[in-house]
Amino acid sequence: LKDESKETFDAKGLTVLPGCIDTQVHFREPGSTDTEDLNSGSKAAVMGGITSVFEMPNTKPPTTNFEEFDKKIKLGERMFCNHAFFFGATAENYLTLEKLKDLKGCCGIKLFAGSSTGNLLVDKENDIEKVFEHASKVVAVHSEDEEILKMRKKLIEKGNVKTHPVWRNEEVAMSSTRRIVKIAKRFNKKAHILHITT
């Protein structure tokens, strides 16, 4: 850098990052670009001090095969920050997950153990086991117990956001996370539990 700064900070012994890393962004491209896309989302990230993002696969269509992943890599050329993309796990694509280890631009595998936006739910234990057995990258998990969610759905009050953490409470997350940790250990694979309930 050629510019002189007005102020100097002593960072000896500290870890210094040029910006923060957001490991879970939903820029919704392709599919729902009326709300945001890779270009606008990455601009907003940079303006907020985020210099690297990992984008989620629950788009339309979802990023669950090499064709859609390649399209997303191409779309990523319009982004303004460092980026990588998650490859979505399904009950059907588990054999593909073995082939991701050296896939350029892939930061990991996203598993939705509880229902969320999109149709990537993998909630049956044998399907979750197949995902972990064949995973060649870290598996990032939306960790909620779908059966408990179904039982608690009656607690939702339409229009009342305060019922969201009542419906999707700590036990919903803990039950699923216990199962995920057990499966990950059995297959000696890495799991990253996302947005935990506190």
Where are each of the predicted segments found?
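Histidine/acidic residue-rich metal-binding segments in metalloenzymes
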Residues: L95-T198
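N-terminal metal-binding scaffold of metallo-dependent hydrolase/deaminase domains
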Residues: L1-D3
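Hydrophobic faces of well-ordered beta-strands that scaffold small-molecule active sites
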Residues: G19-V25, V53-E55, H83-F87, C107-L111, ...
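Metal-associated gating/positioning segment near the N- to mid-region
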Residues: A11-R78
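A generic structural signal for alpha->beta connector loops
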Residues: S5, I50, F80-N82, G105, ...
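Conserved beta-strand scaffold positions in the cores of enzyme catalytic domains, especially
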Residues: K6-D10
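A glycine-rich helix N-cap at a beta->alpha junction
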Residues: K74-A89
